[in-house]
């Protein structure tokens, strides 16, 4: 485990500038290693509490069923018991996995896996599409933050610079309704339908050229689950809807859910985060990173000089984007730039565009 975590624990020092504000130099570790251990303990305690609570409810429901006098009453209580049993199994599945975050050697990867690559899907996009130019659009208000997570980050503009840009582990083909490769080059499913194993594309890099690694997906959860951000929904979501993430090597990892689901590879496509960008991460994260956009795996990025506070935000196509020749991305992302100008009145936007 220490081999994977050491890089996150080294103190770093530098200065950054954002939207004309200078933030003082910091010198601190991220706290990642302690977080992983503490969060595993927290989840173990929480699961134990949930099981105790469900067992108590089960006793009450069984008594209620025995005391039921009508078929309708028995049917209702039986349905409640069925739902409770399902929840108990979900929690037991998680207890059996022992940890929320795990670090293992590649030799511990299950050998019976059948790997898929989705390369039999047809291309997406039109080969006749020409690249170049600027796509102009407008927003009515300037976002209160450009942070990806934390307080006020879930604004109407986040989709334009994050959700519609960042790449997932796999894509879902609009015609075949099958998975195709994205950040992951190959994937495999566990027999119980709860876990997806991923092999990252060795070519996958962030927009600053840094390689994407398995541990980045653990780090992506760390920055969302730590006490340094205000994100109650995300914290509750990942706590309840995910069971485990295991790193086997720099390019291989798995994600498990508490129970089997359809479209499993989409549900297990957890967010990644570039650790080198968050080496100032700490209690003042939301203020320090207020106007900073992290390196992306997608085709567009926001340069600091293209943030005109109160006026506009411009995305630029990543030079030498790692997926520019990818079968499923080569004919998309054609504009050189995407510019969003603040125009409060729709009628004015109609005149301009």
Give the ranges of each region predicted by the language model.
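N-terminal lobe/hinge region of extracytoplasmic solute-binding protein
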Residues: 117-121, 133-189, 222, 295
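Long amphipathic alpha-helical scaffold segments
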Residues: 78-143
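Bacterial Sec signal peptide processing site at the extreme N-terminus
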Residues: 20-33
């Amino acid at each position: 485990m220490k081999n994977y975590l050491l890089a996150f624990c080294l103190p770093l020092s530098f200065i950054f500038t954002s939207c004309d504000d200078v933030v003082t130099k910091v010198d601190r570790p991220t706290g990642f290693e302690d977080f992983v251990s503490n969060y595993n303990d927290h989840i173990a305690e929480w699961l134990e509490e949930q099981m105790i609570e469900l067992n108590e409810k089960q006793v009450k429901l069984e008594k209620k069923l025995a005391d039921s006098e009508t078929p309708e009453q028995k049917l209702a209580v039986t349905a409640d018991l069925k739902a409770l049993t399902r929840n108990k199994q979900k929690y037991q599945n998680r207890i059996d996995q022992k940890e929320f975050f795990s670090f293992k050697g590649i030799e511990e990867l299950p050998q019976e896996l059948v790997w898929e690559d989705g390369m039999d899907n047809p291309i997406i996009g039109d080969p006749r599409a020409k690249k170049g130019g600027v796509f102009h659009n407008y927003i009515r208000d300037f976002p209160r933050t450009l942070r990806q997570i934390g307080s006020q980050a879930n604004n109407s503009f986040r989709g334009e610079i994050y959700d519609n840009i960042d790449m997932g582990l796999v894509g879902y083909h609009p015609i075949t309704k099958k998975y195709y490769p994205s950040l992951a080059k190959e994937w495999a499913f566990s027999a119980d339908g709860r876990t997806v194993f991923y092999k990252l594309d060795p070519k996958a890099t962030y927009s600053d050229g840094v390689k994407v690694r398995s541990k980045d997906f653990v780090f992506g959860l760390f920055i969302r689950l730590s006490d340094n951000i205000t994100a109650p929904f995300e914290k509750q979501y990942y706590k309840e809807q995910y069971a485990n993430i295991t790193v086997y090597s720099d390019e291989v990892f798995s994600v498990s859910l508490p129970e089997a689901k359809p479209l499993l590879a989409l549900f297990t496509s957890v967010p990644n985060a570039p650790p080198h960008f968050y080496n100032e991460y700490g209690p003042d994260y939301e203020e320090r990173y207020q106007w900073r956009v992290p390196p992306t795996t997608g085709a567009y990025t926001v340069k600091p000089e293209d943030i005109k506070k109160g006026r506009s935000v411009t995305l630029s196509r990543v030079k030498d984007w790692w997926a520019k020749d990818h079968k499923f991305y080569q004919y998309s992302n054609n504009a050189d730039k995407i510019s969003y100008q603040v125009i409060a009145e729709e009628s004015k936007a109609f005149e301009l565009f």
